[in-house]
């Protein structure tokens, strides 16, 4: 190390700058005295050159080290001093050093201070000076190429702005919520990092010289040519036009921020594009909805409304491949109200329905100031559609929801075929007189009887209403049957229900004393029976289930007798797959359903006929009808009629035991015995069931069953 004295004040400024830049300080006074003792003599300047050439800057020494290697430390420091003198300019010749502590030094003038040179700092300064030379050469190259740097003065001033920008500082005039970001990569990262001994102000003083490198200028050129100040919080969206919207004022930005987003209306299924290419614009123009050559004037932004808002951006010209449609025209106006009313068919209730072809009057009043230039349908299209509707009533073109909300149209849509037929029949019978309605043929049948027999429901309904108005609904033909009874016999359950609802009497009888229920029971019309019950409940009529015919039979008796006949035919027929057997099976099923329906309606099984006093169980036992016997005995009240006697004193067990040549006789007797029939009961001739059993193998089995039961009952209690 070498201690240099500053000789004169002429180079004092440069020396102070070097001293301030070095920031070298002595760490110990012992080292200072030690340093003075280790100074080489002034007569050896060549030794310094030799040592610098041999050692060089590769072996620097610490200024505060206590090493004993004096030659190494002194040689490195002397080299640093030589370099310092070469940078600072010509120095004055060294004066003879005064002898201090036995060592001679050159005299350099009055002592002004001590500077300790740091070799590491000198190395950094050397590297920076090399960069400054390279940057100066690059600037000269750019000047020779004709690059104008004046146009980038504004950017350079922004980049070289002194000091670190603080948080609250705003670089734009806009509000803080939409402040545009500066797209400069060198703004937050300075090109050089100052050392701890340097201040930020010194760094910014040297910054303009160090930023003039080739890479920095190239980055500035790229930033200026390619980028524009765009806010990171704002997305510019355009449906068709890719032109960048110019930067708006802070007031407009604030209004956009608080007022909500405003988009242009979708142009006829147009795809969503953001700054698309020209080729994409041509493809998207095919789907444009607005008319050709339509330019919307720029309007100020309004507050958000539920109505349709449009963008103030100009619409680009159409593509050559664009095909005009019905709604395109040179003039754009809203459709007149008269044409819309004709299109909707005078539907007053459909005004509240959202229709793409029409806007409500209230909406038009609200937006009349700024939507007068925007059209959704030209007047020519309205006229074309009105003319098309007038030309053809059965046109397929119709507006959606045009029939909604109209009570007449709702009734029209909900009308059934029967209602339409009734209207047709009423129009046909409008001119029929009263005498013609009441006229009869040779058999005493009226128009109503004939219509019911033919199954013409609509005509029967119209005639029945007209006959009921004349109080002639229950008029009868030559057999004493009314139109209602004819409908029951014809198995027209719908007509039966209509007639009962109109007012036909359900308990009327014919010439045989049969009520409509007797006819249903004999024929097995279970659906008609249900229709009578339903109609009677609706018309508040009482149905007499115990009414008897001239034979004294109730409807249930008639149904059992009819079923016995079918069972007898099935037992006698030996061809199970013949058509006759299939028909009998169907009739058998219908009769069983009719009997069940009668029981459900409330028919009494224990009811007796007027002539013989037989119950329904007696009638079922006469044919060994297992199906009906089982049906009756499964009722909760079976014990009240299982031992019921007829007028001759016979029970159902007497009847079943006395049968001959019946395949199901044994099963019928066993079933009756199991359900509580008494074999000891005697009739008027003092006969028990066992006395009536015929001879034969089947008779022996029946006697065994009856005796076994009777023996158990007659057994003595001991």
Curated annotation (Swiss-Prot):
InterPro entries: Ankyrin_rpt (IPR002110), Ankyrin_rpt-contain_sf (IPR036770), OCA (IPR047571). Keywords: Activator, ANK repeat, Nucleus, Repeat, Repressor, Transcription, Transcription regulation. A motif (Nuclear localization signal) lies at residues 164-179. One of its GO terms (biological process) is cytokine-mediated signaling pathway. Residues 404-718 are annotated as: Interaction with NFKB1/p50. Induction: By TNF, IL1/interleukin-1 and bacterial lipopolysaccharides (LPS). Residues 1-20, 58-108, 186-211 are annotated as: Disordered. One of its GO terms (cellular component) is cytoplasmic ribonucleoprotein granule. One of its GO terms (molecular function) is POU domain binding. Residues 58-83 have a biased composition (Low complexity). Residues 1-17, 84-97, 201-211 have a biased composition (Basic and acidic residues). Residues 108-130 form the OCA domain. Residues 321-394 are annotated as: Required for transcriptional activity. Expressed at high levels in peripheral blood leukocytes and lung, at moderate levels in liver, placenta, and at low levels in spleen, kidney, skeletal muscle and heart. It is found in: Nucleus. Its main location: nucleus. ANK repeats lie at residues 443-472, 479-508, 512-541, 551-580, 582-607, 612-641, 648-681. Pfam families: Ank_2. Involved in regulation of NF-kappa-B transcription factor complexes. Inhibits NF-kappa-B activity without affecting its nuclear translocation upon stimulation. Inhibits DNA-binding of RELA and NFKB1/p50, and of the NF-kappa-B p65-p50 heterodimer and the NF-kappa-B p50-p50 homodimer. Also seems to activate NF-kappa-B-mediated transcription. In vitro, upon association with NFKB1/p50 has transcriptional activation activity and, together with NFKB1/p50 and RELA, is recruited to LCN2 promoters. Promotes transcription of LCN2 and DEFB4. Interacts with NFKB1/p50. Interacts with RELA. Interacts with AKIRIN2. This is NF-kappa-B inhibitor zeta. The lineage of its organism: Eukaryota, Metazoa, Chordata, Craniata, Vertebrata.
């Amino acid at each position: 190390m070498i201690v240099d004295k500053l000789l004169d004040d002429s180079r004092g400024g440069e020396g102070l700058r070097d001293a301030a830049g070095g920031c070298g300080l002595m760490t110990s006074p012992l080292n200072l005295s030690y340093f003075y003792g280790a100074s080489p003599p002034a007569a050896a300047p060549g030794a310094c050159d030799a040592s610098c050439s041999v050692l060089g800057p590769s072996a620097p020494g610490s200024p505060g080290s206590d090493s004993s290697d004096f030659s190494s430390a002194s040689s490195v420091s002397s080299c640093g001093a030589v370099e310092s003198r070469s940078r600072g300019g010509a120095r004055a010749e060294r004066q003879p050093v005064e002898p201090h502590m036995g060592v001679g030094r050159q005299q350099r003038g009055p002592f002004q201070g001590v500077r300790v040179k740091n070799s590491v700092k000198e190395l950094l300064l050397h590297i920076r000076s090399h960069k400054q030379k390279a940057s100066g050469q690059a600037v000269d190259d750019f000047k020779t190429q004709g690059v104008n740097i004046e146009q980038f003065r504004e950017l350079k001033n922004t980049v070289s702005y002194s000091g670190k920008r603080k948080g609250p500082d705003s670089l734009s005039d806009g509000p803080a919520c939409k402040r545009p970001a500066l797209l400069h990569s060198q703004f937050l990262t300075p090109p050089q990092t100052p050392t701890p001994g340097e201040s930020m102000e010194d760094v910014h003083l040297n910054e303009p010289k160090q930023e003039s490198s080739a890479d920095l200028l190239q980055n500035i050129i790229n930033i200026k040519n390619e980028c524009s100040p765009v806010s990171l919080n704002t997305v510019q969206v355009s449906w068709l036009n890719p032109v960048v919207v110019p930067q708006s004022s802070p007031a407009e930005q604030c209004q956009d921020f608080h007022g909500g987003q405003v988009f242009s209306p979708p142009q006829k299924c147009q795809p969503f594009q953001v700054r698309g290419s020209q080729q994409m614009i041509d493809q998207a123009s095919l789907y444009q909805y607005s008319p050709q050559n339509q330019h919307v004037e720029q309007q100020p932004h309004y507050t958000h409304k539920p109505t349709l808002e449009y963008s103030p951006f100009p619409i680009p010209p159409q593509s050559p491949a664009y095909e005009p449609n019905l709604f395109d025209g040179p003039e754009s106006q809203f459709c007149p109200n008269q044409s819309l009313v004709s299109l909707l068919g005078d539907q007053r209730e459909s005004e509240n329905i959202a229709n793409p072809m029409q806007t409500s009057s209230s909406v038009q009043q609200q937006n009349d100031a700024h939507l007068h230039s925007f059209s959704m349908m030209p007047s020519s299209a309205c006229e074309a559609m009105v003319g098309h509707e007038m030309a053809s009533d059965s046109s397929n073109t119709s507006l959606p929801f045009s029939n909604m909300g109209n009570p007449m149209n709702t009734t029209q849509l909900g009308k059934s075929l029967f209602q339409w037929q009734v209207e047709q029949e009423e129009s046909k019978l409008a001119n029929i007189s009263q005498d013609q309605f009441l006229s009869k043929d040779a058999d005493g049948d009226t128009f109503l009887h004939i219509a019911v027999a033919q199954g013409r429901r609509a005509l029967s309904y119209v005639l029945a209403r007209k006959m009921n108005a004349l109080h002639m609904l229950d008029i009868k033909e030559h057999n004493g049957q009314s139109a209602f009874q004819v409908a029951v016999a014809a198995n027209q359950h719908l007509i039966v229900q209509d007639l009962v609802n109109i007012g036909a009497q359900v308990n009327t009888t014919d010439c045989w004393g049969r009520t409509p229920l007797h006819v249903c029971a004999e024929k097995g019309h279970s659906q008609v029976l249900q229709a009578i019950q339903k109609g009677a409940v609706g018309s508040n009529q009482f149905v007499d289930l115990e009414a008897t015919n001239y034979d004294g039979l109730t409807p249930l008796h008639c149904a059992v007798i009819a079923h016995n006949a079918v069972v007898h035919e099935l037992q006698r027929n030996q061809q199970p797959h013949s058509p006759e057997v299939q028909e009998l099976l169907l009739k058998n099923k219908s009769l069983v359903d009719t009997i069940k329906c009668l029981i459900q309606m409330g028919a009494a099984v224990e009811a007796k006929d007027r002539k013989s006093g037989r119950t329904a169980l007696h009638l079922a036992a006469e044919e060994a009808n297992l199906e009906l016997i089982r049906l009756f005995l499964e009722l909760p009240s079976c014990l009240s009629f299982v031992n019921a006697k007829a007028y001759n004193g016979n029970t159902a067990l007497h009847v079943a035991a006395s049968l001959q040549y019946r395949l199901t006789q044994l099963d019928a007797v066993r079933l009756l015995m199991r359900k509580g029939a008494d074999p000891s009961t005697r009739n008027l001739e003092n006969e028990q069931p066992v006395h009536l059993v015929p001879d034969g193998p089947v008779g022996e089995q029946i006697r065994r069953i009856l005796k076994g039961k009777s023996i158990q009952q007659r057994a003595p209690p001991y």
